[in-house]
């Protein structure tokens, strides 16, 4: 059985872990607050384990499911990510929550790749709201999962992971496309307030 190591114990971590457990993956939560991690693991059941950041990583894939503002504090303490597939599920929202912290033409995912050059970074899960991930569908339809990556093996691994966990994976191309995916996620967040959808809407490509 493959294992997924998820960094974080918040709503996004819960969503990805829920889908992973349902698909038969082993799940390891890597956390700074061990009590919070254990509480989530208890709710998820199915042998979900909890480790602290800096401890052994058991997952074949590592997922960053923490606020973007915490990434720089967490990446180095995580330890060696050499050769690992690292999913960036973050959105680089600025401290004032008025927009993206990145400059035009750059992305949080590429900044993470620079912080962890030995890892193979894949952008994924940042455009799907956590509640929808827990539900695993929207109006009876699979959720669209947009991904971007440079490393082909990592791309293939995340496509397989996404499909096995019930998503319809849409490959957008190179990691540089993360800038577009992060802008799309920010727009989707803003629409929650103008449309009153309470973070329950989903982005979908209608073929």
Regions found by a protein language model. Name each.
Residues 1-39, 43:
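NAD(P)+-binding Rossmann beta1-loop-alpha1 motif at the extreme N-terminus of oxidoreductases
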Residues 2-3, 85, 144:
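Residues that mark the start of a beta-strand
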Residues 5-6, 64, 147:
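Hydrophobic Val/Ile/Leu positions in short beta-strands of Rossmann-like dinucleotide-binding domains
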Residues 26, 47-49, 85, 120, ...:
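Conserved beta-strand segments of alpha/beta enzyme cores
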Residues 45-47, 51-96:
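Rossmann-like NAD(P)-binding element
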Residues 90-137:
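Rossmann-fold NAD(P)-binding glycine/threonine-rich loop
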Residues 144-207:
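Active-site-lining helix/loop region of Rossmann-like oxidoreductase modules
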């Amino acid at each position: 059985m493959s294992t997924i190591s998820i960094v974080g114990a918040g709503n996004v971590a819960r969503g990805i872990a829920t889908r992973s457990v349902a698909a038969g993956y082993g799940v390891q939560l890597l956390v700074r607050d061990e009590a919070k991690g254990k509480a989530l693991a208890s709710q998820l059941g199915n042998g979900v384990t909890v480790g602290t950041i800096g401890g052994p990583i058991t997952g074949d894939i590592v997922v960053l499911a923490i606020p973007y503002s915490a990434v720089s504090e967490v990446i180095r303490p995580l330890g060696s990510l050499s050769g690992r597939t690292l999913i960036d599920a973050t959105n680089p929202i600025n401290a004032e929550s008025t927009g993206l912290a990145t400059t035009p033409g750059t992305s949080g995912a590429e900044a993470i790749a620079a912080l962890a050059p030995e890892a193979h970074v894949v952008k994924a899960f940042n455009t799907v709201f956590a509640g929808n991930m827990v539900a695993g569908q929207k109006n009876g339809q699979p959720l669209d999962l947009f991904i971007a990556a440079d490393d082909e093996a990592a791309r293939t691994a995340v496509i397989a992971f996404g499909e096995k966990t019930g998503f319809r994976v849409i490959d957008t191309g190179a990691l540089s496309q993360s800038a577009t995916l992060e802008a799309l996620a920010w727009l989707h967040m803003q629409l929650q307030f103008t449309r009153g959808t309470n973070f329950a809407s989903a982005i979908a490509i209608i073929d």
